Amino acid sequence: MFRQEQRWPRQLWPMGSLQPDSGNASWNGTEGPGGGTRATPYSLQVTVTLVCLVGLLILLTVFGNVLVIIAVFTSRALKAPQNLFLVSLASADILVATLVIPFSLANEVMGYWYFGKAWCEIYLALDVLFCTSSIVHLCAISLDRYWSITQAIEYNLKRTPRRIKAIIVTVWVISAVISFPPLISFEKAGGGGQQPAEPRCEINDQKWYVISSSIGSFFAPCLIMILVYVRIYQIAKRRTRVPPSRRGPDAHAAAPPGGAERRPNGLGLERGVGPGGAEAEPLPTQVNGAPGEPAPAGPRDAEALDLEESSSSEHAERPPGARRPERGLRAKSKARASQVKPGDSLPRRAPGAAGSGTSGSGPGEERGGGAKASRWRGRQNREKRFTFVLAVVIGVFVVCWFPFFFTYTLTAVGCSVPRTLFKFFFWFGYCNSSLNPVIYTIFNHDFRRAFKKILCRGDRKRIV
């Protein structure tokens, strides 16, 4: 992402990010643009291998993130405003794959900067901007999830498309503030002295910028993400550990301000419908007589890390007038509850059973302890699954980016980092752009269904 490495002798720098040292480089002569002989750092076989691997990375990144964007705009289940975060994140990753990685690859295999000074400045700015934006997006998504859980009614009524777009604009502004000023306003260090024979493309290498940009682009967002996700996990764990035997009668919470209508969503919670008709997050009901504490029966509490939850429910997908008899719905709900497997979503209850956690509280409720026990086992499985997803999200993010930013900061304070190791970390960070669609969508049923619909249109009736 950033184009600075250890300060080897400047006459040995053929380019800005991956400068070979004088002892280990193997160079092959090639014909340069001006007719002279230029040095290339790799043999033909290694060059072809690198081009194929990075080309595959580019294709996977573009394909996966384009699928995410199409799914959000075409699937009814993904119309929730918070899914705009994923659209913006996917757009940033696509831009990294199309406007940054190809030029980084050319810079690497050619051994010098071929594309001129003007594009060098643009390329450096876009490189830092897009990669920083991708990281800050993940931080914004984690904060959005945290607020939607801790301030369920208030925040979810305010979570409008306009507000989400404003947050997205803020993310891009923060990324630009980190990226652009040093490239435009400050003179690059080491500008004097003998100029190298090969054109280079270098970013600001002043110590203050390396440290501050590393903190702003990675360490601060990463710390926020970890703290927020730990808090989300603690909340979800506390809610899912309330057993059915200790739960009091569920009472319907008072209608939220603003005249929002409430609909049962089949999860033991109720979904608020805002003035614009957009569905908000499930509104909490009372647990053990404590108003405002969300009921622990809903899988959305346990699955707090499913970043973009479904905005539809089973009853909403049926056409009007297609309601089944209550008895049949109740039987189907019980049958599905008894078939919960580890990692599966909990069964959704019939519309008439929403908000009824105990026997005798409503006509559409589920009676008997068997269904409750099944739901409780399902919640335990969801907690395990939640732990796994949490580990994947934080682990992959840190694994991809921490090595690069750590070694990048070490070089600023004068520590020696092997050139090959730094190059590996540099390219490994780019892999996060291709992994984001997997991490943030494959664990969500609505995205899986949308992907199947996009890729297998001939099977549309079965999927929808």
Curated annotation (Swiss-Prot):
Q: Where is the composition biased (Polar residues)?
A: 19-29
Q: Hey, which stretches end up on the Cytoplasmic side?
A: 74-84, 144-163, 232-388, 445-464
Bias category Gly residues: which stretches?
354-363
The answer on whether this UniProt entry bears the keyword Thylakoid reads no
Q: Where is the composition biased (Basic and acidic residues)?
A: 312-329
What molecular function does GO assign, one term?
alpha2-adrenergic receptor activity
Task: Give the chief site where it resides.
Answer: membrane
Instruction: Detail the disulphide connectivity of this chain as listed in its UniProt entry.
Output: 120-201
Q: Which UniProt keywords apply?
A: Cell membrane, Disulfide bond, G-protein coupled receptor, Glycoprotein, Lipoprotein, Membrane, Methylation, Palmitate, Phosphoprotein, Receptor, Transducer, Transmembrane, Transmembrane helix
How the protein sits in the membrane? Answer: Multi-pass membrane protein
Positions bearing Omega-N-methylarginine: 367
Q: Where is the lipid attached (S-palmitoyl cysteine)?
A: 456
Q: How does it assemble?
A: Component of the ADA2A-containing complex (ATAC), composed of KAT14, KAT2A, TADA2L, TADA3L, ZZ3, MBIP, WDR5, YEATS2, CCDC101 and DR1.
The entry sums up its family as follows: Belongs to the G-protein coupled receptor 1 family. Adrenergic receptor subfamily. ADRA2A sub-subfamily.
Q: What is this protein called?
A: Alpha-2A adrenergic receptor
Q: What organism does the UniProt record list as the source? A: Cavia porcellus
